[in-house]
C-alpha cells in the first residue's frame, strides 16, 4: 500500500526570480514564508504552489469544458509532489458591486432574511398596528361573533387611491350582474356610461351583499358564498361596513392592517432582499443611495461666461449640438454667451439646466422678418443624470459621476428595502436595525433572541439561529467585531476582505486542503493579532496545511515551520536562506533572525521633531462612527494615526481630511464626510496620497515610464550621431509606437501560442529574441548599449551607467534610495508587489521639485514590508519631513509608531464603540492613556527596546 507523503516537495522552481530551488514543506502545519520585499515569497507561494494547484484542478475537467473556462499557464517548475487541493485567500477586495455587502458575501444576510420571513411579526406602516391574516372560516366566525343581529354591507376593494375615470370597469361590473359600488365612501348605483373624475384619486369597492347577520343555517350558506365572492373580487381582501355607524373593517387572507386596510403579501426570504423587486426600495432600486447633480460642479465659477467654459461639462466646444442649442436659448432669452453666467436671466439659466420644448418667434431688425426658433433641449441636469443611469460604457458613467453627488436615499433612508420589509420586527428590531449593528452587538442580540420567542417560533428558528451564531463567531475570532452586515464590500480594505474569506473557510470545515494566505494581519491591531493566529491554528487542527506569506513577528514565532527567503531582493534573492522551527531560525545569521532576536532593531529617535508652528485644525468630524471630534494636525513633522481596526482612522483621514484638501487644492470631486470647519489650509500647497495601488494596469507600464525617466532616455538616444543621421525621433524608441518596435510581438517581447485544449504557451519572440524593438532601432547605441539593454538593466546598474547625466541619474537614484535597486527599468508593473509600487511612487515624489509645504498621506505603508524594508522606508519618509513637509501615516506597526513625532490615537474600540479622540501628542506620553489599546502595546515596545539598549 502506498504511503501518504507528509511533505509538499518542490523541485527546480524557477518562477520569476526563484533560483531553481528545491524545497520540502511539511503538511498539516502552519508554515510562514518571510523575507525582504521582492525576495520571491509570493513567487513561491502563489505563482508556483497555487498556480500548479489550480492548473491540476482545471485538468480534471473534460477538454470540452476547459475550452470555455480557459487554461492556466504551467508554472516554471520541474516537479511538485504531495500537493493537496489549494485555496488561496488573497488581499483583493471582494467585490466592486454596489449591491455586495458584508452580509451577502458571508451569507449571514441570507439566514437573517430567512429568520424574518419565518418568525418576524408584521406591523402596519400606517397605524403601527400588528398585521393580521384570516382564512374564510375565521372571517365567518368573527362576523358571527362581532356583527350578530347587525346590518352590514360586504364589500370587495377594487381600486385603492388611484386616478382614472374607470368607465370600462363600471361597465364590466354591470355586465357581470352587480348593481352597486361604493365610490369614495358613498354607495351608488351602477348606471350605463358611469364614470368619475379622472384627475382625482379614488377608492372604489364593489358591493357584494347587504344583510343582517344571523346564525340561521340558510343565512350561513348565503354568508359563505358572499364571503368567497368578496375575497375573489378583492383579491383575498374584503371589507365589512356596519351601517349603524358607517364604520368599516378589513379582512384579508394576506397580512393586513385592520384599520387602514393596507396589506402585505405573505413574507418570503426575497421580501427582505434588496436585490429582488419584491424587497428593494422602489426609489433607489436597492442601492441605498441616490445620485443627484451638484450645480457647484457644473458651474464652479459664475463670474466667467459660457464661451469661456463656465459650464464645465460643456467645455468650450462650440461645434457641439448642445452648444448650438444653448445659442438658441441665448437668442430666446436675450443674453450673450460671452456674458458672465451670474448675469444670465434666471429663466434662461433654468432652461439650460432643466430643459425646454418651447417655440419662440424673434423679429430680425436686419432682415425685417420674424424667425421661429424651437428649443428641443433636455437640460444639462437631465442629460448628466441619464448619462449616469443609462451609460453604455464605464467612461461615460465616470464622466457623469464627476458632476454628481451621492445622497442617502429619501425613500428608504439608506436601508435599501421597501416600506413593507422594514415593518417586520423581531424583539422590537427590524432587519435594517440588525444589519446596522456591529457584529459583536449582533452576536449578543442573536444569542438572547430565543428568550423572546414562543415555543413554536423557537422550534422554527433554532437551526437558523445556530447557523447565524456559528458564522458570527468565526468573524469575531478574526478581529472583525466592528464591521456591520450592511457595510459595502467595496469599502473593505484588502485585509478585511481577506479575513472575511478566512472566516468563511473556517466555517466550511473542509479537511485536507492547502490554504495559502497573503499577509492576513494587514490592518489588524496588535490586540486582535492573537485571535487571528488562533484562527489559523484552528484551520490547521482541522487537518489542513496552512501557508502564510507574512512579516508579522508574532505570526512568525507562532509558526510550526518558518521559511526565510533572500538573501536580498530581485536578482539577488530567490533562494531559501533558512528554514525550520522558529527556534531553529533564531540561531541562523540572517536579517530576519537578527530582527526576531533583537540583535537588529529600528531604534527610537533620540529627539522628536517639533512642528513648524502651523497646524491644520479640523473641527466637528461626524462621518461614520466619529463622535464629533476636533483634531489638530501639526505641520512639518511625521504624524501617526493609530487605533484598533474600525476605530475611525480611515474615516478621519481618507474620507474626511484628504477629500477636503484635494477639493481645496485641486478641485477634487470626492465629497468629504460631514465636518463643521477646517482652518490652516493656507499653510499647505500640495497634498499627495501615496497608496499601494498598482503604478500601471498593463504589462507595458514599468518603473521607467512611471517615473518619467524613459522619456529622457529616449530623447538621449535620439541625440546619438547615428539616430540623427537616420532622422529618428523619440517615438522610434518606444515599444508602444509603430515604427521602432518589433511588429511581430508588437513590442511585447513575447508571443502567445494558442494550444487549443492545452494552456497557452508564452515564447520569446523569434524576430526580436525578446528585445521588443526591431533591428534598425537596436542598431542605435549609447555608450555601447541599445535601448533594450538599458531597459533590462537593474536600477543599481542604471545608476552607474547614467551617473554623468543628472536629469536621469537623480530620478534613478531616488528609486535606489527607497530600496528598489534590484528591480529592472523595464520590469512590468503588473509583477510589482503593493509595497514596491508604493515605494516607486515615493521615489517619484522625492524626485520632483519640492516646495516644503506638501502634505503626504500614507495608509499602512508597511504592508508587504520586511523589518529591513521598513527601516529603509522610514529613512525615505524622514527625508521628506526634513525638507519641511508633513507626512501622515495610518499604521498599526509599532516600529513605525515609535518613530513618529506626533500620535493621534482614535478609539477606544472599533465600530460604534470607537470614533473618539483618545490622545494627541508625543508617543512617550501616549503610554499613560489607560483607555488606549495602542498605549499598552507601545509601552511594551518602548520598554523592550530600552532594556535591549541597556
Question: Where in the sequence are the language-model features?
Answer:
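Conserved phosphate-binding elements of NTP-dependent enzyme cores
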Residues: 1-950
Amino acid at each position: 500500500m502506498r504511503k501518504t507523503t507528509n511533505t509538499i516537495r518542490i523541485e527546480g522552481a524557477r518562477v520569476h526570480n526563484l533560483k531553481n530551488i528545491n524545497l520540502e514543506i511539511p503538511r498539516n502545519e502552519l508554515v510562514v514564508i518571510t523575507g525582504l520585499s521582492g525576495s520571491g515569497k509570493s513567487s513561491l507561494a502563489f505563482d508556483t504552489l497555487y498556480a500548479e494547484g489550480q492548473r491540476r484542478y482545471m485538468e480534471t475537467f473534460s477538454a470540452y469544458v476547459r475550452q470555455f473556462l480557459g487554461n492556466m499557464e504551467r508554472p516554471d517548475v520541474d516537479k511538485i509532489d504531495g500537493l493537496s487541493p489549494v485555496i488561496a485567500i488573497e488581499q483583493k477586495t471582494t467585490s466592486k458591486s454596489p449591491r455586495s455587502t458584508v452580509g451577502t458575501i458571508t451569507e449571514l444576510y441570507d439566514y437573517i432574511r430567512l429568520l424574518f420571513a419565518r418568525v418576524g411579526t408584521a406591523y402596519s406602516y400606517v397605524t403601527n398596528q400588528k398585521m393580521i391574516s384570516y382564512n374564510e372560516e375565521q372571517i365567518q366566525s368573527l362576523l358571527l361573533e362581532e356583527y350578530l343581529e347587525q346590518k352590514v354591507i360586504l364589500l370587495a376593494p377594487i381600486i385603492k387611491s388611484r386616478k382614472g375615470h374607470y368607465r370600462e370597469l363600471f361597465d364590466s361590473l354591470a355586465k357581470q350582474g352587480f348593481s352597486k359600488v361604493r365610490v369614495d365612501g358613498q354607495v351608488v348605483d351602477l348606471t350605463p356610461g358611469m364614470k368619475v373624475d379622472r384627475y382625482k384619486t379614488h377608492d372604489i369597492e364593489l358591493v357584494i351583499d347587504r344583510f343582517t347577520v344571523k346564525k340561521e343555517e340558510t343565512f350561513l350558506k348565503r354568508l359563505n358564498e358572499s364571503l368567497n365572492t368578496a375575497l375573489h373580487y378583492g383579491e383575498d381582501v374584503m371589507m365589512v361596513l356596519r351601517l349603524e355607524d358607517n364604520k368599516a373593517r378589513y379582512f384579508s387572507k394576506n397580512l393586513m392592517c385592520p384599520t387602514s386596510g393596507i396589506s402585505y403579501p405573505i413574507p418570503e426570504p426575497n421580501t427582505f432582499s434588496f436585490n429582488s423587486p419584491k424587497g428593494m426600495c422602489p426609489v433607489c432600486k436597492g442601492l441605498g443611495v441616490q445620485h443627484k447633480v451638484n450645480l457647484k460642479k457644473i458651474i464652479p465659477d459664475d463670474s466667467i461666461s459660457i464661451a469661456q467654459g463656465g459650464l464645465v461639462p460643456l467645455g468650450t466646444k462650440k461645434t457641439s449640438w448642445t452648444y448650438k442649442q444653448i445659442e438658441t436659448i441665448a437668442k430666446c432669452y436675450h443674453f450673450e454667451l460671452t456674458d458672465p453666467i451670474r448675469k444670465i436671466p434666471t429663466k434662461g439659466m433654468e432652461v439650460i439646466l432643466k430643459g425646454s420644448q418651447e417655440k419662440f418667434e424673434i423679429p430680425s431688425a436686419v432682415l425685417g422678418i420674424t424667425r421661429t426658433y424651437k428649443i428641443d433641449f433636455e437640460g444639462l441636469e437631465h442629460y448628466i443624470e441619464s448619462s449616469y443611469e443609462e451609460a453604455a460604457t464605464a467612461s461615460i458613467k465616470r464622466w457623469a459621476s464627476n458632476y454628481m453627488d451621492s445622497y442617502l436615499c429619501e425613500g428608504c433612508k439608506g436601508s435599501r428595502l421597501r416600506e413593507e420589509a422594514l415593518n417586520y420586527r423581531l424583539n422590537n428590531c427590524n432587519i435594517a436595525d440588525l444589519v446596522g449593528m456591529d457584529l459583536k452587538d449582533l452576536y449578543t442580540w442573536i444569542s438572547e433572541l430565543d428568550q423572546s420567542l414562543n415555543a413554536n417560533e423557537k422550534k422554527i428558528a433554532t437551526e437558523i439561529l445556530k447557523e447565524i451564531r456559528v458564522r458570527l463567531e468565526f468573524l469575531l475570532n478574526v478581529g472583525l467585531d466592528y464591521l456591520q452586515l450592511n457595510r459595502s464590500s467595496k469599502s473593505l480594505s484588502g485585509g478585511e476582505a481577506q479575513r472575511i474569506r478566512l472566516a468563511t473557510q473556517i466555517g466550511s470545515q473542509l479537511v485536507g486542503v492547502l490554504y495559502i494566505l497573503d499577509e492576513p494581519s494587514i490592518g489588524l491591531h496588535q490586540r486582535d493579532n492573537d485571535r487571528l493566529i488562533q484562527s489559523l491554528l484552528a484551520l490547521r487542527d482541522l487537518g489542513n496545511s496552512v501557508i502564510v506569506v507574512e512579516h508579522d513577528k508574532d505570526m512568525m514565532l507562532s509558526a510550526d515551520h518558518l521559511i526565510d527567503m533572500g538573501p536580498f531582493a530581485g536578482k539577488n534573492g530567490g533562494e531559501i536562506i533558512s528554514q525550520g522551527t522558529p527556534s531553529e531560525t533564531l540561531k541562523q545569521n540572517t536579517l530576519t533572525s537578527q530582527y526576531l532576536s533583537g540583535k537588529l532593531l529600528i531604534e527610537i529617535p533620540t529627539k522628536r521633531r517639533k512642528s513648524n508652528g502651523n497646524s491644520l485644525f479640523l473641527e466637528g468630524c461626524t462621518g461614520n462612527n466619529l463622535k464629533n471630534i476636533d483634531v489638530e494636525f501639526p505641520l512639518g513633522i511625521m504624524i501617526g494615526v493609530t487605533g484598533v481596526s474600525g476605530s475611525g482612522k480611515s474615516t478621519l483621514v481618507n474620507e474626511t481630511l484628504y477629500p477636503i484638501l484635494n477639493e481645496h487644492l485641486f478641485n477634487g470631486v470626492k465629497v468629504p464626510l460631514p465636518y463643521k470647519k477646517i482652518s490652516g489650509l493656507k499653510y499647505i500647497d500640495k497634498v499627495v496620497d501615496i497608496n499601494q495601488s498598482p503604478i500601471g494596469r498593463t504589462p507595458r507600464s514599468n518603473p521607467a515610464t512611471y517615473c518619467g525617466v524613459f522619456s529622457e532616455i529616449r530623447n538621449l538616444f535620439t541625440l546619438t550621431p547615428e539616430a540623427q543621421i537616420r532622422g529618428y525621433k523619440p517615438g522610434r524608441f518606444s515599444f508602444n509606437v509603430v515604427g521602432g518596435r518589433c511588429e511581430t510581438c508588437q513590442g511585447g517581447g513575447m508571443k502567445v501560442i494558442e494550444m487549443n485544449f492545452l494552456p497557452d504557451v508564452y515564447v520569446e519572440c523569434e524576430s526580436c529574441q525578446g528585445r521588443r524593438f526591431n533591428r534598425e532601432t537596436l542598431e542605435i547605441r549609447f555608450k555601447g548599449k541599445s535601448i533594450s539593454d538599458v531597459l533590462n538593466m537593474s536600477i543599481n546598474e542604471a545608476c552607474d551607467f547614467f551617473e554623468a547625466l543628472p536629469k536621469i541619474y537623480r530620478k534613478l537614484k531616488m528609486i535606489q534610495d527607497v530600496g528598489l535597486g534590484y528591480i529592472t527599468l523595464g520590469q512590468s508593473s503588473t509583477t510589482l508587489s503593493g509595497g514596491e509600487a508604493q515605494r516607486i511612487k515615493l521615489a517619484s515624489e522625492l524626485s520632483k521639485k519640492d516646495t516644503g509645504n506638501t502634505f503626504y498621506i500614507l495608509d499602512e505603508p508597511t504592508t508587504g514590508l520586511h523589518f529591513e524594508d521598513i527601516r529603509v522606508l522610514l529613512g525615505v519618509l524622514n527625508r521628506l519631513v526634513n525638507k519641511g513637509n508633513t507626512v501622515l501615516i495610518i499604521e498599526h506597526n509599532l516600529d513605525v509608531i515609535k518613530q513618529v513625532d506626533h500620535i493621534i490615537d482614535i478609539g477606544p474600540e472599533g465600530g460604534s464603540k470607537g470614533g473618539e479622540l483618545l490622545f494627541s501628542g508625543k508617543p512617550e506620553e501616549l503610554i499613560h492613556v489607560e483607555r488606549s489599546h495602542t498605549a499598552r502595546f507601545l509601552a511594551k515596545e518602548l520598554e523592550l527596546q530600552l532594556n535591549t539598549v541597556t
